[in-house]
Amino acid sequence: MKQSLAVKTFEDLFAELGERARTRPAGSATVAALDGGVHGLGKKILEEAGEVWLAAEHESDDALAGEISQLLYWTQVLMTARGLSLDDVYRKL
């Protein structure tokens, strides 16, 4: 049986980002991104969405999964910046 690595869930990531926003550890890229504001985060999300599309067209499934994970990360950072909860988004699914 193949052993898998520990998996971080969507909820785990959101909790981790919230903790970083609250504790503001020195040198945290998440804190720097939050401090950069919604405009910068929006630009990053557009960049990552483009990379997802390109990976879907031209890359392996593994590379695509990596790009999607980055898009999810930056989307959650934006959610944190705006004060949205996971439930705010889940209600729209």
From Swiss-Prot:
Keywords: Amino-acid biosynthesis, ATP-binding, Cytoplasm, Histidine biosynthesis, Hydrolase, Nucleotide-binding
Family matches, as Gene3D superfamilies: MazG-like (1.10.287.1080)
Keyword Metal-binding carried by entry: no
Family matches, as SUPFAM superfamilies: all-alpha NTP pyrophosphatases
Catalytic activity: 1-(5-phospho-beta-D-ribosyl)-ATP + H2O = 1-(5-phospho-beta-D-ribosyl)-5'-AMP + diphosphate + H(+)
CC per GO annotation: cytoplasm
A GO term for molecular function: phosphoribosyl-ATP diphosphatase activity
The keyword Cytoplasm appears for this protein: yes
Pathway stated in the Swiss-Prot or TrEMBL entry: Amino-acid biosynthesis; L-histidine biosynthesis; L-histidine from 5-phospho-alpha-D-ribose 1-diphosphate: step 2/9
One GO-annotated biological process of the protein: L-histidine biosynthetic process
Family, as annotated: Belongs to the PRA-PH family.
Name of the protein this chain belongs to: Phosphoribosyl-ATP pyrophosphatase
Organism of this sequence: Mycolicibacterium paratuberculosis (strain ATCC BAA-968 / K-10) (Mycobacterium paratuberculosis)
Organism lineage string: Bacteria, Bacillati, Actinomycetota, Actinomycetes, Mycobacteriales
